Amino acid sequence: MYSKNIIYFNKAFDKIEIKNLINWFLINYGNIKTTKLLDKIKKFGLIHATNAGISIGLNDLIIPPSKKNLVEISNKNLNKINKKFKNGKINLITYLIKEKRTWDNMNENLKIESIKNLKQNDLLNSLYTMTLSGARGNINQVKQLISMRGLISDSQGNLLNLPIKTNFKEGLNIVEYFISCYGARKGIIDTSLKTANAGYLTRRLIFASQNTIIRKTNCFTKYKKKIKIKYETKQEFKLLKEELIGRINVKTIKEKDNNKIIISYGQDICYTFKKILNHNINIYIRTPLNCILTTGICQMCYGWNLATGKIVELGETIGTIAAQSIGEPGTQLTMRTFHLGGIFTSKIKESILSPFTGKIWYDLNKNGKKTYNKFNEKIFLTSKEKKITIYENNINKSIYYLPPNSYIFVRPGEKVFKAQIIAETFDKQKKKENTKFNEVKKIKSNISGKKYINKKNKKFNNLYWILNANFITFNKFYHKLTDKLNFKKKSYTISKNMQDKNKKSKKNLQLKISIKNILNNMEKKKSKTNKKFIFINEILNKNKTIILNKPKKEKIINNKWKIGKFILKDEITNKNRNLYPSQIIQEKKDTSVLKKVTPYRLNDKILDKNPYIMKKNALLYKAVTKKEKNKDIIQGLVEIEKLFEAKKSFIIDKTKNLHEILKDLFVNYNKKYNNSTSTRKSIEIIQKYILEEIQSIYKEQGINISNKHIEIIIKQMTSKVIIKNAGNSPFIVGEICNINSIDNLNKNYEHKIIYEPILLGITKSSLYTQSFISQITFQESIKSLIKAAIENKIDWLYGLKENLILGNLIPIGTGFK
């Protein structure tokens, strides 16, 4: 554009590509020429957008042809899982997890197929163009139109088990529409109520960091952050790049062979960072968390101004910029959730599907081992990159290279069908998008009967059997004796359910009932003993199975099964399958009579305290399971607020309570180091944890925020300490002060000030600023004024708010002194 050598970019330019182009142009040609380029891009884009007249019609919504096949495969898998559950091979918890994973896999694969279908058949499709342009729209919104809505979450973020298999073009049936209303309600509630929460978070962030300004060139801190240069994937490379670019190096590093300087002390790491990444070394950089100025940050600790790509200037309001950078995406994405309609999004492992029906082959002896997954299924776990080949015939074949830590579900030589999941790849760097919480599941018996647990037989380990039985209850009645009473022998006869045809039955089982008072006029029923009651051809209870003898000499029943033993489905012979899990109740010469039972597989460490005889729908046991909860930006903002406010939970959980963790860390470090070092080391770990947690929430929503912005807010939260021993100073025990101020004072005192680190939320840190004028403009105005008057405080007018209120020139930019 500005040189004789014209550069051609033969590719589609979406939002990311345009961003990279402008960034590259700014570095090479400067601000003025970049401004002219932006004007030309804007004019070019608007002219062509007007001429194109892009809009969506019903014909643009193209449903992928492979959807029908994917639905059939998912239904087959669900039927297999259901059979395993009914036969007691898997428990209820595993059944629910596998059911959800089946729909997740189908939803994800259908989304990929939808994009692939549009890409192959209609590149100029309006929907495809808008979706992949890089605008705020998301593929999860578009897939509802052309693939399937999938699993839905209610207004609390809880998962509903029944998925919506149709899309909006096909139309929803009455049940699917009813489920869909849950999500629609969630979207409306979030948009109307939660937007205010996102705005209030921004306000608190602004108040916490408004006085953070670039005040000096260098603070000469001895503290630094160590970064190890090591990456394997593109994602790790990208994270290293974001971490390093624009930072100041604090240690000269040379090559081992020729002492050539790779990077020198005080040098800012620019876009030539690739030469650093070629060496397996450790880089030491300055961060805002390491700055030891009592107010504000120095240029060396902050590094580049990300807007210009140059060292930040003195008087720059980096605190306000940081607060806006963190708060703005939350406000925007809160309003975006309305379009998602409550669909449950879950990051699953990447599945490898078979491209056609054929046979699979790979070497079992190399780069992996046979093992079992958490569902007790046989898999092959790869330790290194693994080659697998799928043959349709001698000519057509497909080759895949699986990364380490992948699961292969099929064995070599096994037949695979088109779109069947043959393997899953696992990325250790990815964090789960959905939060998990413990849920107690109640497992109830669907029949009445007798319980039995076989603890000796390993084959039936963890199986809980319920034998079919009916409860017989007798009604009690009484009457005062006024007349003569006749006593007769009364019994309740239980006839045999299974008897041979056309033969007299043996004596039936009789239960004698002892009745003290029976009315004289009660109804009488007579029955003869040994009378034929049941004929096989006439009545057959559905829960009973009878096996008749075959006209063969060979025995059908395996003799190892004795009366009372349990047998699973398909476990008698190969020719004659047992249709249901059963118990042998009668053994004859050539036949066995089986009774249908219902097996339940128990989880480990479940205590059995149930009665011997159980009624239908009686509680068998309770199992604790991990249940997923949809984690969109609404739930994300709640988590971000908890971290920034450093809230204490009512139930003290030391693994999650940051205040307790900080206290424990300080106690442990205090045994090895002095007071100042142990405080800074314990604070450093908490700072790292908060930074990683906040970044993970935003990155799950596709938002990139520079670590610098979050570090500035975290510095405000962790820069205070509480005094435990005042030493020679005029401070009072329990007073909260800045750690850098105390360290400067300790240099002059013989009896040092002893202190402990504390963690303040953004609201509290705003109330502990040096300026009392700033405090009264935020919260607790009367309290702050009275406290300032009693303590005879002086406001030195360092920040923005205090100068603004008094009508002074604010100390930033040209007003900075």
Swiss-Prot record:
Of the GO CC terms on this record, one is: DNA-directed RNA polymerase complex
Q: Which CDD domains match?
A: RNAP_beta'_C
Q: Which InterPro entries match?
A: DNA-dir_RpoC_beta_prime, RNA_pol_Rpb1_3_sf, RNA_pol_Rpb1_4, RNA_pol_Rpb1_5, Rpb1_funnel_sf
Instruction: Could you list this entry's UniProt keywords, alphabetically sorted.
Output: DNA-directed RNA polymerase, Metal-binding, Nucleotidyltransferase, Plastid, Transcription, Transferase, Zinc
Q: Where does the source fall among the domains of life?
A: Eukaryota
This enzyme catalyses: RNA(n) + a ribonucleoside 5'-triphosphate = RNA(n+1) + diphosphate
> How would you classify this enzyme at the top EC level?
transferase
Q: Which GO terms describe its biological process?
A: DNA-templated transcription
Q: How is the cofactor bound?
A: Binds 1 Zn(2+) ion per subunit.
Return the EC number: 2.7.7.6
**Do you know which Pfam families this protein is assigned to?**
RNA_pol_Rpb1_4 (PF05000), RNA_pol_Rpb1_5 (PF04998)
Q: State the needed cofactors, names only.
A: Zn(2+)
MF terms per GO, please?
DNA binding; DNA-directed RNA polymerase activity; metal ion binding
Principal place of residence: plastid
Q: Which residues bind Zn(2+)?
A: 219, 291, 298, 301
User: What is its subcellular localisation?
Assistant: Plastid
Q: How does it assemble?
A: In plastids the minimal PEP RNA polymerase catalytic core is composed of four subunits: alpha, beta, beta', and beta''. When a (nuclear-encoded) sigma factor is associated with the core the holoenzyme is formed, which can initiate transcription.
The UniProt entry's sequence similarity note says: Belongs to the RNA polymerase beta' chain family. RpoC2 subfamily.
Task: Describe the task this protein carries out.
Answer: DNA-dependent RNA polymerase catalyzes the transcription of DNA into RNA using the four ribonucleoside triphosphates as substrates.
Name assigned to this protein: DNA-directed RNA polymerase subunit beta''
Name of the gene: rpoC2
